[in-house]
Amino acid sequence: MKGTAASALLIALSATAAQARPVVDERFPYTGPAVPIGDWVDPTINGNGKGFPRLVEPPAVKPATANPRNNVNVISLSYIPKGMHIHYQTPFGLGQLPAVRWGKDPRNLKQHGAGLLSHFQDWSSGRSPGIVQRRRAERHGLHQRSRNTQAAGQGCPMRELPFAWPTEVTISYADELGIILVPTTGRSATTAPVLLFRVAYSGRVQEALARGEIPDQGEVVANRRRNFTAYQHPFRMPGPETGGVGNFWYSFDYGLAHFVSIDGETDFANSPEWNFAEDVTGNETLPSEAETFITDSGPFGNVNGSVHETKSYEQWHLAEAGSGEGRPQQDPVGLRHEPPPYVQFRLFLYQLHVREAFEGLLLSMAWMLTSLGDVCPFFKLVHHPLTLSSATSTGTSSLSSRATAPSILPPCEQQHLLCPQRQVHHPHHQRHGRQH
């Protein structure tokens, strides 16, 4: 059975020649607000003070003056085969194709890459392991720096994490930015968030909040990201280039590490967001209106076999592919992340299902780090390693605790997973935790 069956609403929109066309079930007319922003209590773009707390994201790049003529907001970086994807935006317009100059000397950036929308030309050639690279987004003059990781086989450890690893954006609320992996050793342990996004963290982070923000408020997100189609594009992940699917799951190699990001909401047995095939019983070929919920989604990849068996899903096989026979020698450090569902009321039921789906595979692959979940109070589920032992959950899933369990990457540096804390009370999302 294909994940593009007629009952599936909204499959991955970044389709390629190898991916089937999206199929939409239009039997039941949409009756929601004119602007489908994911909040039926407050259906306005600017917010009417009801419903979800509005999310806030100040510019990642602070303007040099109070009245800037131009400013580029660097939002995210992700590495893809033979290049890098850099997402940045400006409210003033560039007047030319987006471009990046890069090199070792900030005063002489000889290399140049240009592109449109989600791609840049290959700018990976000529880079050497361990060398600090400088880059500048054209039209605003901001210099940034990063250090390349060590090449495979080199024994010296990484002294700094060279990039942020933004993972897939959650489905159930399009404003979710995903998780970010950042260095947290020494003084940077308290200032790491300023390296990426100035957001309203709790008082533990030594960063002054922007005017009008309150602790634990979260981020404010641009209006254009308040629907499914929009969120597929501003936060594009390299699914097609790496054998994955859109923003939902992908993998890549960088330096000594192999990264895998998968979808923690759909595309495995007993996932918290049911796919439509699970409501089709007996002689039915499509779900009835009573069986169709706004939280149903997927599957987004192919399913060869029963939807109740995780190994039937394409996503499981992508994770399995990372455990090839040559992988331990090629990439001795494996890092895998899975964001959980945005709203999950039955926390431990979700843990059980995701462990049943992936635990055996991940342990057999001997991953150095497996991160499962956010720092948000609903699902602090960082485990070392992912295991059915209840001891690993102690202290990491307390609703009253703000601390997170650090993950160690020997001989590299200590890492934390950081995300804004959410406060959600919404009746339409209670079906996430329904019993299978």
From Swiss-Prot:
Catalytic reaction annotation: a phosphate monoester + H2O = an alcohol + phosphate
SUPFAM superfamilies reported for this sequence: Metallo-dependent phosphatases (SSF56300), Purple acid phosphatase, N-terminal domain (SSF49363)
Carbohydrate attachment residues: N227, N283, N304
GO molecular function terms listed in the Swiss-Prot or TrEMBL record: acid phosphatase activity; metal ion binding
Enzyme Commission designation: 3.1.3.2
Keyword Protein biosynthesis: no
Keywords, comma-separated and alphabetical: Glycoprotein, Hydrolase, Signal
Signal peptide range: 1-20
Subunit architecture: Monomer.
Name of the molecule in the record: Phosphate-repressible acid phosphatase
Designated gene of the protein: pacA
